[in-house]
Structure formats: C-alpha cells, structure tokens
Amino acid sequence: IWTIDNENLKNLVGKEFEIWNKNQINQDTKISKKNPTWTRNERIIVLKYYFDSKDPVELSKDKNKCQEISTILKALNKISETSFESDNFRSIEGVRRKILNFCSIDPEVEESGLEHIAKGDAEIFSEFLKKGEDKIKEIDTMFEIITRPIKK
C-alpha cells in the first residue's frame, strides 16, 4: 500500500500541488458559507410586507420592495450576536423566494408559489392566519420591536 502525505506529494509535484491545495481550501470555505436557516424574526419581517401587500405575488416581483426587505434583514444581521458574513445573505432573490413560500401556503392566493416549503414558514404562517384580523396589528407591533435597534 502506498501512502503519500501532503509534504511528500508537494515534493513530488511541486507548485501544482500548492496551487491545487489553495484552490481546494478556497472552495471548501465557499461551500461552508451557506446561509443559515431563517429566524422567526426574519420571517415576521417578510410577513409584515406580505400581509400589507394587496397582491403578494406582485410583491415577490417588486424588486424595490424585495430590496427594502433585504436591506432590513442585512442591517439586523450586522448587529446580531450571531452575525453571518456573506454577500448573498438574505438577498433580493432569497426574499422573493420567501414571499413565494408564503404564497404557497396562503389559501387566498390562487397562483402557486414554490413547491418545497420550510417547516418554519408553514408554522408561522398558519399561526398568524389563525389570528384573523388581529394578525396585522400583532405583526405591526412585532415589526416595530424587531426593527427598533436599526432605526436609531
């Protein structure tokens, strides 16, 4: 059985190994930069816009509104104790997909949204759906509390 450790391999193939190894490390680092699971507060922020919208499907297509939501989520992330560093954290596309997830669950939306719904999305949506008209007031209050630290 042949065994070659990194040092022996480096001696055998020289610079090519160093370049390959650096590229591999960079790839591994990029792979580990997957966005974390959405938090309850992040979902509430999206729901605020969702329930305020007359047409959630159109909201998902409104790049400016999705950018606004994304900006709020990123600002909250920066002041969080568990801040996540990534260029695509809660991107416009991520926000759009979250809105479409909620569209999939919403019995009032005729168009279908996305097929695979996160358990947390279904739970929080049904929780607020049960509250009827009170859901808007409660979400507005929660939104104000959640975003207070970034409104200074």
Predicted regions and their residues:
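Intrinsically disordered, charged low-complexity linkers and terminal tails
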Residues: 1-152
